[in-house]
Amino acid sequence: VSHQLTVKKSNIFGKGCFALAHFTARKKIALYAGEVVRGSRKIEARLRRQEAIKIIWIDEDTAIDGAVGGNETAYINHSCEPNSYMRIVPGEKVAIFALRDIRPGEELTINYRDPDHPEVCRCGAAKCRSNR
């Protein structure tokens, strides 16, 4: 649990992860927490059961399930104009970084949609791919 993040109702979707502190561009915000799951079949089975996807793939056979033992970062919503991004870091971990300066009270967002597999997006960003 971070003292710099909180979870509350989001205007994008359900609940969101919000900054309680100022984050400067490229600063690490937090680690994405959860249970490390190994085995693509096991991961796929979890994906089918989850209403809101909280699984982040590390490689083709390993993922982190933020629905089990996760923290506030499991509630980061998608935006076509994100303010943060994820990077895999050593030790089967995923870190969240600020893409630009983020103010306290601002919702953290990441572009986690696959451009090769378009789907309807309702993120509300001015440059949302569904508006094109």
What is each model feature region?
Residues F18, A52, C80-R132:
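C-terminal SET catalytic tail plus cysteine-rich post-SET Zn-binding segment of SAM-dependent SET-domain
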